[in-house]
């Protein structure tokens, strides 16, 4: 028995010209189905040193006659370029057939940025139009693209924490959005103290980024994209939301959160989310396979044909 397996490369994904606002819609649509998925915990192996290879499986519910299962394999290996890479294997869950092998790097970045943008939009206090962003590499820019595209109908401001030339490069990347204004802040304490929504895409934080709790004013929403550097907030913020309890429950201060719930319950209307403009809210989104597989399935449906190979499988019982 032979069936065709699509190989979806980065160049094919680029050719789709997917709007970042579409990515925000996709992560919301995926969150809304979270109660109906099967998503076992991530499983990691460590070949050497700090390197890792992690598997992230997820079974999506049936929709319009299709039922997808996928597994994302993500690796961080010292010396590979880029250091962090991922591939997604997408299956037809009804037949068990492998449908596609999808480059996962773009998906990882954009679903991460889209989740942060959706969390900001959902949990920010009323009337906010200013977003303070630090860690302005690829993921930080993905956050900016999603926020800018999702707020096309109004003017917003990005306050950028200066570090090397990252802020200037961020501005250059997003300069074509006519609804976005930019401010570059040099003082770290002022950056935090004046933030209404603080989004950190800092990838490495071996200590607290803002150990002075008084810097976080009432009504602030903090979104640590890589869940690092804000553990002090765990102890005094009014509410904490996470993308998946199985991941967040291992945090050091999980049992000391004042109030905790999964973020998708806010989107479903089961939790009010922000109740007033004084609450300090923390949003932890560790990254879940649900979004990777949802994105891969939508991209597969748009491409399907193209590069690939015929996979020959035994169609009779194998006897030994």
PLM feature segments, named:
Residues 229, 233-320:
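Adenosine-phosphate binding glycine-rich loop
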């Amino acid at each position: 028995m032979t069936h065709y397996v699509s190989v979806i490369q980065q160049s094919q994904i680029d050719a789709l010209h997917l709007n970042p606002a579409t990515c925000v819609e996709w992560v919301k649509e995926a969150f809304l189905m979270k109660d109906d998925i099967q998503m076992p915990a991530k499983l990691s192996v460590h070949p050497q040193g700090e390197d890792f290879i992690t598997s992230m499986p997820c079974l999506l519910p049936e929709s319009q006659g299709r039922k997808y299962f996928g597994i994302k394999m993500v690796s961080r290996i010292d010396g590979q370029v880029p250091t962090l890479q991922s591939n997604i294997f997408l299956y037809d869950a009804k037949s068990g057939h492998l449908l596609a092998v999808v480059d996962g790097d773009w998906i990882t970045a954009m679903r991460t940025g889209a989740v942060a943008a959706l969390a900001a939009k959902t949990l920010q206090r009323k009337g906010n139009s200013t977003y303070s962003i630090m860690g302005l590499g690829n993921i930080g820019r993905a956050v900016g693209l999603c926020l800018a595209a999702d707020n096309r109908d109004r003017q917003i401001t990005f306050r950028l924490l200066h570090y090397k030339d990252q802020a200037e490069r961020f501005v250059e990347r997003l300069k074509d959005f006519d609804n976005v204004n930019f401010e570059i802040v040099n003082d770290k304490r002022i950056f935090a103290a004046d933030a209404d929504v603080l989004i950190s895409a800092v990838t490495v934080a071996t200590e607290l980024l803002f150990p002075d709790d008084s810097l976080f004013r009432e009504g602030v929403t903090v979104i640590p994209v890589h869940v690092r550097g804000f553990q002090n907030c765990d102890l005094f913020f009014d509410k904490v939301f996470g993308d998946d309890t199985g991941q967040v429950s291992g945090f050091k201060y999980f049992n000391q959160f004042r109030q905790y719930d999964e973020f998708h319950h806010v989107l479903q209307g089961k939790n009010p989310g922000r109740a007033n403009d004084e609450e300090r809210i923390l949003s932890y989104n560790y990254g879940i396979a649900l979004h990777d597989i949802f994105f891969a399935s939508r991209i597969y449906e748009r491409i399907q044909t193209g590069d690939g190979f015929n996979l020959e499988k035994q169609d009779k019982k194998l006897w030994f």
